Protein backbone atom coordinates (compact mmCIF):
# COMPACT_ATOMS: atom_id res chain seq x y z
CA UNK A 1 0.00 0.00 0.00
CA UNK A 2 2.90 2.36 0.67
CA UNK A 3 4.13 1.99 -2.93
CA UNK A 4 0.65 2.76 -4.30
CA UNK A 5 0.41 5.89 -2.14
CA UNK A 6 3.82 7.01 -3.34
CA UNK A 7 2.78 6.67 -6.98
CA UNK A 8 -0.52 8.45 -6.38
CA UNK A 9 1.33 11.37 -4.76
CA UNK A 10 3.16 11.97 -8.04
CA UNK A 11 1.69 13.85 -11.00
CA UNK A 12 3.52 12.32 -13.96
CA UNK A 13 4.96 9.08 -15.21
CA UNK A 14 8.18 9.53 -17.17
CA UNK A 15 9.06 7.09 -19.95
CA UNK A 16 12.86 7.09 -20.31
CA UNK A 17 13.49 5.84 -23.83
CA UNK A 18 16.72 4.23 -25.02
CA UNK A 19 17.16 7.03 -27.61
CA UNK A 20 17.81 9.47 -24.71
CA UNK A 21 14.37 11.09 -24.96
CA UNK A 22 12.23 11.19 -21.83
CA UNK A 23 8.49 11.77 -22.20
CA UNK A 24 6.13 12.62 -19.37
CA UNK A 25 2.46 11.67 -19.21
CA UNK A 26 0.01 13.04 -16.65
CA UNK A 27 -1.20 10.25 -14.39
CA UNK A 28 -4.68 11.80 -14.47
CA UNK A 29 -5.01 10.90 -18.18
CA UNK A 30 -3.28 7.53 -17.94
CA UNK A 31 -5.95 4.87 -17.99
CA UNK A 32 -3.71 1.84 -17.99
CA UNK A 33 -0.41 0.41 -19.12
CA UNK A 34 -0.35 -3.00 -20.77
CA UNK A 35 2.56 -5.25 -21.66
CA UNK A 36 1.70 -7.23 -24.81
CA UNK A 37 3.99 -9.19 -27.15
CA UNK A 38 7.18 -7.40 -26.11
CA UNK A 39 5.48 -3.98 -26.37
CA UNK A 40 4.14 -1.52 -23.84
CA UNK A 41 0.80 0.11 -24.56
CA UNK A 42 -0.08 3.29 -22.70
CA UNK A 43 -3.81 3.89 -22.76
CA UNK A 44 -4.66 7.57 -22.33
CA UNK A 45 -8.12 9.09 -21.94
CA UNK A 46 -9.28 10.78 -25.19
CA UNK A 47 -5.95 10.28 -26.99
CA UNK A 48 -4.36 7.76 -29.29
CA UNK A 49 -2.37 5.31 -27.22
CA UNK A 50 1.36 5.42 -27.87
CA UNK A 51 3.07 2.07 -28.26
CA UNK A 52 6.67 1.39 -27.30
CA UNK A 53 8.60 -1.80 -27.92
CA UNK A 54 10.26 -3.12 -24.78
CA UNK A 55 13.69 -2.39 -26.30
CA UNK A 56 12.74 1.31 -26.66
CA UNK A 57 12.17 1.76 -22.92
CA UNK A 58 15.13 2.18 -20.62
CA UNK A 59 13.09 2.81 -17.46
CA UNK A 60 9.96 4.35 -15.95
CA UNK A 61 9.88 6.88 -13.12
CA UNK A 62 7.35 9.09 -11.39
CA UNK A 63 7.59 12.77 -10.49
CA UNK A 64 6.01 16.19 -10.32
CA UNK A 65 4.44 18.08 -13.20
CA UNK A 66 6.80 20.62 -14.73
CA UNK A 67 6.68 23.26 -17.46
CA UNK A 68 10.44 22.90 -18.03
CA UNK A 69 11.81 21.04 -21.02
CA UNK A 70 15.50 20.17 -20.80
CA UNK A 71 17.72 19.68 -23.83
CA UNK A 72 21.32 18.53 -23.37
CA UNK A 73 23.40 18.83 -26.54
CA UNK A 74 26.35 16.53 -27.16
CA UNK A 75 28.17 15.42 -30.30
CA UNK A 76 27.44 11.82 -29.24
CA UNK A 77 23.68 12.39 -28.94
CA UNK A 78 21.04 14.74 -27.63
CA UNK A 79 19.25 14.06 -24.36
CA UNK A 80 15.72 15.46 -23.98
CA UNK A 81 13.39 15.53 -20.99
CA UNK A 82 9.90 16.49 -22.21
CA UNK A 83 7.29 16.31 -19.45
CA UNK A 84 4.74 17.84 -21.86
CA UNK A 85 5.00 15.22 -24.62
CA UNK A 86 1.31 14.33 -24.47
CA UNK A 87 0.08 17.85 -23.73
CA UNK A 88 1.00 19.71 -26.91
CA UNK A 89 4.81 19.84 -27.09
CA UNK A 90 6.31 17.52 -29.69
CA UNK A 91 10.05 17.28 -30.19
CA UNK A 92 11.95 15.63 -33.00
CA UNK A 93 15.69 15.19 -33.39
CA UNK A 94 17.36 15.01 -36.79
CA UNK A 95 21.12 14.61 -36.42
CA UNK A 96 22.02 17.56 -34.17
CA UNK A 97 18.87 19.52 -34.94
CA UNK A 98 16.17 19.73 -32.27
CA UNK A 99 12.80 20.80 -33.68
CA UNK A 100 9.95 21.68 -31.33
CA UNK A 101 6.30 22.30 -32.14
CA UNK A 102 4.37 23.66 -29.19
CA UNK A 103 0.61 24.24 -29.04
CA UNK A 104 0.36 24.21 -25.23
CA UNK A 105 -1.39 27.19 -23.63
CA UNK A 106 1.01 27.54 -20.67
CA UNK A 107 4.32 29.41 -20.74
CA UNK A 108 6.96 26.69 -21.17
CA UNK A 109 10.64 27.05 -20.31
CA UNK A 110 13.17 25.40 -22.62
CA UNK A 111 16.56 24.90 -20.94
CA UNK A 112 19.50 24.35 -23.30
CA UNK A 113 22.85 22.98 -22.07
CA UNK A 114 25.85 21.22 -23.58
CA UNK A 115 27.86 21.51 -26.78
CA UNK A 116 27.19 20.48 -30.36
CA UNK A 117 29.46 21.21 -33.32
CA UNK A 118 26.75 20.90 -35.99
CA UNK A 119 23.22 21.41 -34.73
CA UNK A 120 20.35 23.78 -34.12
CA UNK A 121 17.45 24.58 -31.82
CA UNK A 122 14.28 25.38 -33.79
CA UNK A 123 10.89 26.11 -32.28
CA UNK A 124 7.40 26.71 -33.59
CA UNK A 125 5.21 28.03 -30.77
CA UNK A 126 1.68 29.44 -30.54
CA UNK A 127 2.33 31.00 -27.12
CA UNK A 128 5.04 33.00 -25.40
CA UNK A 129 7.84 30.96 -23.86
CA UNK A 130 11.12 31.20 -21.96
CA UNK A 131 14.43 30.16 -23.50
CA UNK A 132 17.15 29.58 -20.89
CA UNK A 133 20.74 29.26 -22.07
CA UNK A 134 22.59 27.32 -19.38
CA UNK A 135 26.14 26.80 -20.62
CA UNK A 136 25.19 25.93 -24.19
CA UNK A 137 27.48 26.05 -27.22
CA UNK A 138 25.68 25.49 -30.55
CA UNK A 139 27.40 25.76 -33.93
CA UNK A 140 25.42 25.37 -37.17
CA UNK A 141 27.56 25.46 -40.32
CA UNK A 142 24.65 26.00 -42.72
CA UNK A 143 22.07 27.99 -40.78
CA UNK A 144 21.14 29.61 -37.48
CA UNK A 145 22.12 28.10 -34.14
CA UNK A 146 18.68 29.11 -32.80
CA UNK A 147 15.67 29.51 -35.10
CA UNK A 148 12.52 30.89 -33.46
CA UNK A 149 9.38 30.59 -35.58
CA UNK A 150 6.92 32.38 -33.31
CA UNK A 151 5.17 35.70 -33.39
CA UNK A 152 4.81 35.63 -29.61
CA UNK A 153 7.03 37.01 -26.86
CA UNK A 154 10.20 35.09 -26.08
CA UNK A 155 12.08 35.72 -22.85
CA UNK A 156 15.75 34.73 -23.04
CA UNK A 157 17.48 33.95 -19.74
CA UNK A 158 21.23 33.53 -19.37
CA UNK A 159 22.09 31.38 -16.37
CA UNK A 160 24.50 33.22 -14.09
CA UNK A 161 28.05 31.91 -14.15
CA UNK A 162 27.72 30.15 -17.52
CA UNK A 163 29.21 30.90 -20.94
CA UNK A 164 26.85 30.53 -23.89
CA UNK A 165 28.08 30.56 -27.49
CA UNK A 166 25.87 30.56 -30.60
CA UNK A 167 27.60 30.34 -33.99
CA UNK A 168 25.59 30.70 -37.20
CA UNK A 169 26.83 29.48 -40.56
CA UNK A 170 28.43 31.97 -42.94
CA UNK A 171 26.03 30.89 -45.66
CA UNK A 172 22.60 29.40 -45.00
CA UNK A 173 21.49 26.29 -46.87
CA UNK A 174 18.43 26.85 -49.07
CA UNK A 175 15.59 25.02 -47.34
CA UNK A 176 12.89 26.17 -49.77
CA UNK A 177 10.60 27.10 -46.89
CA UNK A 178 9.80 30.10 -44.70
CA UNK A 179 12.41 29.31 -42.11
Which residues does each PLM region occupy?
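Sec/Tat signal peptide C-region and signal peptidase I cleavage site
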Residues: 4-9
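Compositionally biased alpha-helical segments
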Residues: 10-66
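A composition-driven surface/loop motif
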Residues: 65-179
Amino acid sequence: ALCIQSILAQEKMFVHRSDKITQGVLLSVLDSMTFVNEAVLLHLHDQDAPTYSMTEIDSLSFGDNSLQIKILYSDTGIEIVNPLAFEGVSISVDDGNVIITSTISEEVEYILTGTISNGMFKIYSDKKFILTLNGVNITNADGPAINIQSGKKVTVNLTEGTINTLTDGKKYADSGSED
